[in-house]
Amino acid sequence: MSEKMVAIMKTKPGYGAELVEVDVPKPGPGEVLIKVLATSICGTDLHIYEWNEWAQSRIKPPQIMGHEVAGEVVEIGPGVEGIEVGDYVSVETHIVCGKCYACRRGQYHVCQNTKIFGVDTDGVFAEYAVVPAQNIWKNPKSIPPEYATLQEPLGNAVDTVLAGPISGKSVLITGAGPLGLLGIAVAKASGAYPVIVSEPSDFRRELAKKVGADYVINPFEEDVVKEVMDITDGNGVDVFLEFSGAPKALEQGLQAVTPAGRVSLLGLYPGKVTIDFNNLIIFKALTIYGITGRHLWETWYTVSRLLQSGKLNLDPIITHKYKGFDKYEEAFELMRAGKTGKVVFMLK
């Protein structure tokens, strides 16, 4: 193994990132070193690249970016048990304390002292990465790296879609970005019908149809609530899944969901949102779930089994694959323009 590696690094505050050569890190106690086989770009990585207000408050350059990964364990630090060199793995990004009130109740996904791998630590946009052993997930060999790297965001989609009954339910999904597209795949694999998708981008509406959406709506040109009511014989959808983070989409979805329906919210909003709580939530007796992270480790088992079932239609979602990191700037600019689904760097 070489002593040097290439990595995409946020070297300083400001727009962009740099491809640099750095030392291969060494795993410390309770850590493992993985060789990266595939890694994918998340919206969080784009925020760091663009250096938005959140990134400015959270990221401390110089730092290697990236957190979605499939890799192979190549070295084990002191005190690590249950993991071996050669294991094919992915990484849960929430580094939890195990001691706070939430953790002691088994609610690790809302740990009060969470650190995020690849946000608060160096990440996986590199040939090698050091990972806390407690965050390692072992993959079946049958799952290819370009799918295995998607398990972390797939976990977000699974928790959103499967927060309540979904088989045989009518569903409205607002937002067909990468997470929304994964939500479509999970909903279809889980027996939802019809799956209706509201998305303003022509490119993403086409992707939504390829993934399996039964109906697509352009919210800039069509009345979303009217279209949903027409499709559902005036009843509204059983389940509303909000992936966009757009306040208008939230309002439309709450109007379009049937009384006593279920709502799952994953999209993050730009600020405070004004909602008619009385008429859109209370009098409709809606059940609402806020979604963050993934349930450790229940969601990972669900994601892995869905992948092994072969029922998830992920190929249309992976719109761009790059061999190595050389074209990382092109990849990020395409994502900024909304011209991608998931972008994967292949290092195998």
Curated annotation (Swiss-Prot):
Optimum pH is around 10. Below and above pH 10, the marked decrease of activity is observed: the relative activities are 50, 22 and 55% at pH 9.5, 9.2 and 12, respectively. Is stable over a wide pH range: upon heating at 50 degrees Celsius for 20 minutes, the enzyme does not lose activity at pH 4.5-10.0. Its EC number is 1.1.1.103. PROSITE patterns: ADH_ZINC (PS00059). The keyword Iron-sulfur does not apply. Is totally inhibited by EDTA in vitro. Changing residue 152 to C: 120-fold decrease in catalytic efficiency. It is an enzyme of class 1 (oxidoreductase). Changing residue 152 to D: Shows 3-fold higher turnover rate and reduced affinities toward L-threonine and NAD(+), compared to wild-type. Optimum temperature is 70 degrees Celsius. Extremely thermostable, the activity is not lost after incubation at 100 degrees Celsius for 20 minutes. CDD domains: TDH. Zn(2+) 1 binds at residues 42, 67-68. Pathway: Amino-acid degradation; L-threonine degradation via oxydo-reductase pathway; glycine from L-threonine: step 1/2. It catalyses: L-threonine + NAD(+) = (2S)-2-amino-3-oxobutanoate + NADH + H(+). Coiled coil: none annotated. The active site is at 44 (charge relay system), 47 (charge relay system). Its cofactor is Zn(2+). Catalyzes the NAD(+)-dependent oxidation of L-threonine to 2-amino-3-ketobutyrate. Is much less efficient when using NADP(+) instead of NAD(+). To a lesser extent, also catalyzes the oxidation of L-serine and DL-threo-3-phenylserine, but not that of L-allo-threonine, D-threonine and D-allo-threonine and many other L-amino acids. Belongs to the zinc-containing alcohol dehydrogenase family. This is L-threonine 3-dehydrogenase. It comes from Pyrococcus horikoshii (strain ATCC 700860 / DSM 12428 / JCM 9974 / NBRC 100139 / OT-3). The gene is tdh.
